Amino acid sequence: MVINQKNLSSPVAPYDKSGSQSSTKADIPSINYTVDHSFQKRETSGKELSEATPQVTQSLSNQLILTTLNDLYNWARLSSLWPLLYGTSCCFIEFASLLGSRFDFDRFGLVPRSSPRQADLIITAGTVTMKMAPSLVRLYEQMPEPKYVIAMGACTITGGMFSTDSYSTVRGVDKLIPVDVYLPGCPPKPEAIIDAVIKLRKKVAQEDFVERNNFRQIHRYYSISHEFKSSSTVHTGKYLQSSERKSPPKELSEATGIPIQFILKNTQKTEIQP
């Protein structure tokens, strides 16, 4: 498009007595527009085309970040793991000390949440009982995908000292929910919790966005079931209603020389006057 401008240096129209600018048709500068529709085709050789292509220089590479959507997605998730506050025993005391300024686990992007709807990491700190097992499974199912589990402490992993003869302890939380990182100890130190979080971050960084459903753990009930042996009841409660339980034995009265049975009978018959 070619624009020809003429008479642009003409004087400005004078003002009248009222202050408005008086203008006539002859005073307005005329502008003529002529459009050139002819396109010239030129042949570009291979040498000229290579010179026109921008080259990646050192200054340009320092200003650009080249990555994939998969790496960006994993980086965003591993930098903002929000754990659910779930503690059932003494291991949670060590996890609570991690919240302080000495260890400062906020530098890893961990924000503790009290709602499973807003958390993507649950750290089972402490012993899991059979009455607590349905609640734990419900909390895990309410967490949005993708979600991760860290089993903290010996009682959570194998039952700990309650694994031998306890009737109410779950022998391993992996019977209920899938576990990503096992953290042994009784209880583990806050430094060990940080190391477990770092290992979980490395696992998240290696995941694939497209094939993440293929690596989901579905075998939850992996460990062996409880093996109990039935035996006769030791205490039935009937011994509390026996006559020997209500009255002291004869040997006690003979040893002390005091007729205890006679005194107890008299005290039961006497009435306290108001």
Curated annotation (Swiss-Prot):
Needed cofactors, names only, are: [4Fe-4S] cluster
Query: Where does this protein hold [4Fe-4S] cluster?
Result: 90-91, 155, 186
Manner of cofactor binding, per the entry note: Binds 1 [4Fe-4S] cluster.
Q: Which GO terms describe its molecular function?
A: 4 iron, 4 sulfur cluster binding; iron ion binding; NADH dehydrogenase (ubiquinone) activity; quinone binding
Q: Which Gene3D superfamilies match?
A: 3.40.50.12280
Q: Where is the composition biased (Polar residues)?
A: 1-10, 18-27
| Gene Ontology annotations for the cellular component aspect, listed alphabetically | chloroplast thylakoid membrane; respiratory chain complex I
Q: Which domain of life is it from?
A: Eukaryota
> What does the UniProt keyword field contain?
4Fe-4S, Chloroplast, Iron, Iron-sulfur, Membrane, Metal-binding, NAD, NADP, Plastid, Plastoquinone, Quinone, Thylakoid, Translocase, Transport
Which residue stretches belong to region Disordered?
1-27
Tell me, what does this protein do in biology?
NDH shuttles electrons from NAD(P)H:plastoquinone, via FMN and iron-sulfur (Fe-S) centers, to quinones in the photosynthetic chain and possibly in a chloroplast respiratory chain. The immediate electron acceptor for the enzyme in this species is believed to be plastoquinone. Couples the redox reaction to proton translocation, and thus conserves the redox energy in a proton gradient.
Question: HAMAP family, alphabetically?
Answer: NDH1_NuoB (MF_01356)
Protein name per UniProt: NAD(P)H-quinone oxidoreductase subunit K, chloroplastic
What species does this protein belong to?
Chlorokybus atmophyticus
The organism's lineage is: Eukaryota, Viridiplantae, Streptophyta, Chlorokybophyceae, Chlorokybales
